Amino acid sequence: MAKKTMGIHHITAIVGHPQENTDFYAGVLGLRLVKQTVNFDDPGTYHLYFGNEGGKPGTIITFFPWAGARQGVIGDGQVGVTSYVVPKGAMAFWEKRLEKFNVPYTKIERFGEQYVEFDDPHGLHLEIVEREEGEANTWTFGEVTPDVAIKGFGGATLLSEQPDKTADLLENIMGLERVGKEGDFVRYRSAGDIGNVIDLKLTPIGRGQMGAGTVHHIAWRANDDEDQLDWQRYIASHGYGVTPVRDRNYFNAIYFREHGEILFEIATDPPGFAHDETQETMGEKLMLPVQYEPHRTQIEQGLLPFEVRELD
């Protein structure tokens, strides 16, 4: 039986200094830092999670900040553009806000929608689009109030070394619906109302190189542990090499690299980011995986200090 994902769970990228990263995603874009922890495989590196007030799936962008990291190259085998969705009528606010913080942007139209495209301080390609769908983000930070706040992901643009094979995966395995073709892009839509629109570029542009300003992986939603195990079996049955389940504290994760060389993850919606903090205090303290807690002092000494601060 075919399966269907509700859409994007989170997107994880590599960036530079954590203060620059936090100033942009919290200070400029108004997202909430819902979790500060460390990389499970490299406890000397932060893992920072930004999203809506509740840190819900479909709103979470996560970062490995490496100060002084080599600049990456955006290209095939990666998410090329991360799309954010805002309420109808909010675009004028965002254009003024980007201007206020001297962030250059361009306006484009794709599939009948108006987008504002810009880069973060470390070179990640971002865009904003207005849509009715998706619940409002009730978080207020600085001048970013719920009537204009980013709701979460509008979706993403995928760059593939083998677009035909990636297209087959999206439609026939991940369960997305093909809803249109325009120029060099095919559009897919998932069943969810956030993180639900995927544009696939049909022409390869050259292999990307991992580094600052590039996306490391895109994660798709599984309802729960049982659903994730179904996904694991289902994907493996189609010839993909899938990892064992990995406990990431706030979700369980499995990974596989699709034929276009993009690293895919399937992550469970539960338990979520209030798993080890209260909803009210999420993101305020460094939370460590249990195996690293005995080494907290040493780990904290090796991490660059940063703070969430209003820039308005």
Swiss-Prot record:
Reported induction: Repressed by MhqR. Strongly induced by stress due to exposure to 2-methylhydroquinone (2-MHQ) and less strongly induced after diamide or catechol stress. Not induced by oxidative stress due to hydrogen peroxide or methylglyoxal.
Entry's Gene Ontology BP terms: catabolic process; response to toxic substance
Classification via Pfam families: Glyoxalase
Cofactor: record remark: Binds 1 Fe(2+) ion.
Keywords: Aromatic hydrocarbons catabolism, Cytoplasm, Detoxification, Dioxygenase, Iron, Metal-binding, Oxidoreductase, Repeat
Cofactor annotation: Fe(2+)
Domain annotation VOC: ranges: 7-131, 152-269
GO molecular function, one term: dioxygenase activity
Family recorded in the similarity comment: Belongs to the extradiol ring-cleavage dioxygenase family.
Protein name stated in the entry: Putative ring-cleaving dioxygenase MhqO
Organism phylogeny: Bacteria, Bacillati, Bacillota, Bacilli, Bacillales
Gene that encodes the chain: mhqO
